[in-house]
Each structure stands twice: as C-alpha cells, then as structure tokens.
C-alpha cells in the first residue's frame, strides 16, 4: 500500500477542500483517464483496491498510472475514549482529491477495455467520477476568422 517514507509532522490539520484541482487536470501518461467530479479524501486502501480491480480486469495488457498519492495523515481516538486529552493517534493516510483531478490513467489497451477497467475502479472509490480521453487536437480552439 502507498504510504509516505517520512513526514515532517505526524498529525496534520484537516484543511479545506474548496474549489478545483490546481494541477493534474490533463492526461499526461496514458490515453484514457478517470477524473474526479467531486472533492473527497481517498484512503490508501481505496487506491489499492481500485488498482487491483483495474489490473485484474486488464490481465497482462496495458499500463496503469496512479496520479494521486496519500500524503496526509488522519487521526482517530479509540472507541469509548472521552473527549479531551489531546489529539488521537494517526490512523491512516489519505490523498486529498479535488474535483477535476485525473486520478488514474490507462494506456496500451482499447477504449472499451479501458472504459470497463476504469468503471470497476470507480466502484471502489467514494466519489463520482467520469471517463476521459486524451484530446487529439494539440492547440485546442483557435480564434482565426
């Protein structure tokens, strides 16, 4: 599972998840991708479950790129512990995913195989997602009259 090798602070603030993702909004490595439609925390277990679902469906064909990494720790106090007496112990790791972020990419397979593999992966995630293709036009729109 994905965990950071070392961190500066073991216990982090929760933070806000306002707005869209700043980077990682375009497909960089593969031909097809899974884009987040809403913002959420994605745990390292959910990322691993999605990866396994994709790779098992694709068998030995294609390549998978994971574009998110769980670098934020979250804490939890034990069950039955009263309020107060400090922050709880670190319980796991999450990736902060904002809407518009490409989470997974697939290359080297046909579109219907990629679509089904990413659908299986999206079933393992707690957010709404959409299937995206790499845009064929390089320059985008032009203003030539």
UniProtKB/Swiss-Prot annotation:
Biological processes per GO annotation: translation
tRNA-binding recorded as keyword: yes
Name of the protein: Large ribosomal subunit protein uL16
PANTHER family, per the entry: 50S/60S RIBOSOMAL PROTEIN L16, LARGE RIBOSOMAL SUBUNIT PROTEIN UL16M
GO molecular function (one): structural constituent of ribosome
Family annotation (NCBIfam families): rplP_bact
Keywords, in A-Z order: Ribonucleoprotein, Ribosomal protein, RNA-binding, rRNA-binding, tRNA-binding
The family this protein is said to belong to: Belongs to the universal ribosomal protein uL16 family.
Gene from which this protein is expressed: rplP
